[in-house]
């Protein structure tokens, strides 16, 4: 009988240890806003970042996007300020405060009514996004044919 209690105790201790080491699910939701000459404009939707032990999902829900139906890019930008800046010539750069594009996270499909409801799963962690911005751009990178076009930030979620 004493052996049974020892085995049960060991199994209980192991299960507690495994549970304590399991990665907690982290979910953060931020507003997606339109970028304009004043910085952040009207809200068009939300982006939810969920980090689990199996990876990170980025769920985009938006309506009223002012782009043609089809593909747009979702990118990670280095800063979290939607404020416009000026270039060397003094021209206004909408979204200039976002800094540099740090990477393409995938493409989103915009419906004919300007809506998006899509989830992208990647290997990012929330710590990779914190203090930065998720940006919807008007173009997607085409790595298959080695072409990259100029991407204009249109909508942003500040983290």
Task: Spell out what each predicted region is.
Residues 6, 16-159:
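N-terminal leader/targeting pre-sequences
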Residues 1-9:
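Bacterial N-terminal signal peptides that target proteins for export
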Residues 11-14:
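Short, linear, compositionally biased motifs with a strong N-terminal bias
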């Amino acid at each position: 009988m004493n052996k049974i209690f020892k085995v049960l105790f060991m199994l209980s201790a192991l299960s507690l240890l495994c549970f304590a080491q399991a990665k907690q699910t982290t979910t953060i939701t931020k507003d997606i806003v339109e970028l304009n000459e004043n910085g952040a404009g009207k809200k068009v939707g939300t982006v939810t970042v969920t980090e689990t032990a199996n990876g990170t999902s980025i769920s985009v829900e938006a309506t009223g996007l002012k782009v043609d139906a089809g593909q747009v890019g979702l990118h990670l930008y280095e800063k979290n300020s939607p404020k416009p800046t000026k270039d060397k010539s003094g021209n206004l750069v909408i979204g200039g405060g976002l800094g540099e594009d740090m990477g393409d996270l995938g493409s989103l499909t915009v419906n004919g009514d300007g809506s998006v409801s899509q989830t992208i799963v990647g290997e990012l962690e929330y710590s990779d996004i914190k203090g930065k911005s998720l940006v919807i751009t008007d173009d997607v990178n085409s790595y298959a044919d080695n072409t990259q076009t100029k991407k204009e930030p249109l909508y942003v979620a500040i983290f």
